[in-house]
Design a protein with these regions (language model features):
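Phosphate-binding P-loop
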Residues: 1-6
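Glycine-rich phosphate-binding P-loop
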Residues: 7-25
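Conserved beta-strand elements of the Class I
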Residues: 8, 33-35, 133
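N-terminal phosphate/diphosphate-binding loop that engages ATP/GTP or pyrophosphate donors
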Residues: 20-94
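Short, high-confidence coil segments that cap the C-terminus of an alpha-helix
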Residues: 30-32, 86, 110-115, 128
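Short, well-ordered secondary-structure micro-motifs
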Residues: 45-47, 102, 127, 144
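Phosphate-binding/switch loop-helix module in NTP-utilizing enzymes
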Residues: 88-123
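Conserved catalytic-core segment of NTP-binding enzymes
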Residues: 114, 119-201, 205
Length: 206
């Protein structure tokens, strides 16, 4: 697989603002591609709109869809990636056991120097060049898939509007109460006003 700059965008919860951030980053990173990872379960329908009713796609092998014809649908996360200017979009539909194979297959299709990957679980299988963990300051709860990859975090990103200093203060109070260890204990915290700095940093890693 050709080496690409991989920026992972994970999230504390399903509605933390991951997709919004991916789209904001795509607008500032012309030529980058995007990957959406969807973990499905047979006969189940999750809160993620993409995960809902994907069970017909699940099989012995991961399903990878690429290109506008296969991945664009208005209102869906992959459609939003296209609207934000992604050079290409890849959608990997996998079971829990197929996450590693699915992300490898999706990344093998990337032709751009950089790619944004939305999701948490794939980080147990692929080393990203930079991992942003998105959280809402008013909802600082960690779902299991996020907690399992905190040791991969490069930085936290606080989504939503509001005073940046207050958002950081709220987050730091939570971080102190959680007694986090490893990279998550002192990883830098970004807010929307820091997007230009993040974009500049990502441009340098390609």
């Amino acid at each position: 697989m050709t080496k690409r700059a991989i920026v992972a965008v994970g999230g504390f919860t399903s509605d933390s603002g991951k997709t919004t951030l991916v789209c904001e980053l795509l607008r500032g990173l012309p030529g980058w591609e995007a990957v959406k990872m969807t973990r499905g379960h047979y006969r189940s329908c999750g809160r993620d709109p993409h995960a809902c009713c994907v069970s017909p796609l699940l099989g012995e092998e991961p399903v990878i869809r690429s290109g506008r014809e296969e991945t664009y649908e208005a209102g869906k996360d992959t459609g939003k990636y296209w609207e934000a200017g992604a050079a290409n979009v890849h959608w990997a539909v996998v079971t829990d056991r197929q996450v590693g194979q699915g992300i490898e297959l999706a990344l093998a299709r990337v032709r751009s120097p950089g790619v944004l990957v939305e999701g948490n679980s794939f980080l147990r299988h692929v080393a990203a060049d930079f991992t942003l963990m998105v959280a809402r300051a008013d909802r600082l709860k960690l779902k299991p898939s996020a907690r399992r990859v905190l040791d991969r975090v490069s930085a936290f990103y606080l989504s939503g509007e509001g005073d940046a200093a207050l958002l950081r203060e709220t987050f730091e109070a939570w971080r102190g109460s959680e007694n986090l260890s490893g990279p998550a204990a002192d990883a830098p915290v970004y807010t929307r006003e820091d997007l230009p700095r993040l974009l500049a940093r990502f441009r340098r890693i390609v």
